[in-house]
Amino acid sequence: MAAVTLSVSTVKPLGERVFVKVSESEEKTAGGILLPDSAKEKPQVGEVVSAGPGKRNDDGTRAEMEVKVGDKVLYSKYAGTDIKLGGDEYVLLAEKDILAIVN
């Protein structure tokens, strides 16, 4: 079996899934205290890097995705599958786990 090298350009979500680059978490508190990695909360905001074609309806057509590449989104805290690529963090989510598009 040939080895596969994963990169952002090789990950293509299927169905109603979305591939999101996770935003950096805060390094310090509002009071200026530096936070160690163990004390940082998992970010819930990121930018859509790629999106699947949408959910297939009963009649065989596809429902259009509500998010598109480049959208900044807020998603559920424990949703998706975490993926690390090239030192950056990503999450593969179902579109239903996205709570809002952030402008």
From Swiss-Prot:
Keywords: Chaperone, Cytoplasm. Its main location: cytoplasm. One of its GO terms (cellular component) is cytoplasm. InterPro entries: Chaperonin_GroES (IPR020818), Chaperonin_GroES_sf (IPR037124), Chaprnonin_Cpn10_CS (IPR018369), GroES-like_sf (IPR011032). It is found in: Cytoplasm. CDD domains: cpn10. SUPFAM superfamilies: GroES-like (SSF50129). It comes from the Bacteria. One of its GO terms (molecular function) is protein folding chaperone. GO terms for biological process: chaperone cofactor-dependent protein refolding. Belongs to the GroES chaperonin family. NCBIfam families: PRK00364.1-2, PRK00364.1-6, PRK00364.2-2, PRK00364.2-4, PRK00364.2-5. Heptamer of 7 subunits arranged in a ring. Interacts with the chaperonin GroEL. Together with the chaperonin GroEL, plays an essential role in assisting protein folding. The GroEL-GroES system forms a nano-cage that allows encapsulation of the non-native substrate proteins and provides a physical environment optimized to promote and accelerate protein folding. GroES binds to the apical surface of the GroEL ring, thereby capping the opening of the GroEL channel. This is Co-chaperonin GroES. It comes from Trichodesmium erythraeum (strain IMS101). The gene is groES.
